């Protein structure tokens, strides 16, 4: 079992964190103003860290599940950031949908500090996370990927290593683009149908 630091316990992050506790891992979580999930995890044995640096010092794997690249960067950098407390050979995993350019920059900074950085954006929902059924699009150093793969399997069903740093986030953005394109096309088709289809509906007869 692994000592894991987890940053970002919103809907998806909290589901993943509870799953990791279920699988026997030791968790340290970063506190925030929204106490419900933090208190629930601490009640199940997790430790609350005062800042990201302290969290990193107690972890062999650091996981982030936050909304934007700016949020990832703010928790990685600075005197209280993950990089300030990073241990040698620690693997940092970004589960968010971040910008590939930011990911590559952070990967270089983590490597310089003696660790490894993986981008691993997610597919599916918090309900899937609770049951360990997420899709995970991972990229970065293959040795680091193989090291944390058993832990990824605790939260994921379909896990892919997609190549160099940034490739996971690139594929996730392409996947999102595809999904939004299909949704927009469907909306246009329905709008056209409403304009052109003049026959009475079955409910009108």
Q: Where does each model-flagged region fall?
A:
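NAD(P)+-binding Rossmann beta1-loop-alpha1 motif at the extreme N-terminus of oxidoreductases
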Residues: 1-57, 61-64
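Rossmann-like NAD(P)(H) cofactor-binding subdomain of soluble oxidoreductases
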Residues: 52-56, 61-62, 69-134
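Rossmann-fold dinucleotide-binding core
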Residues: 4, 97-177
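Single conserved hydrophobic/aromatic residue that forms the stacking wall/gate
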Residues: 197-205
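A general structural signal for well-ordered alpha-helical segments in protein cores
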Residues: 38, 59, 69, 79, ...
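Cationic-aromatic interfacial patches
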Residues: 189
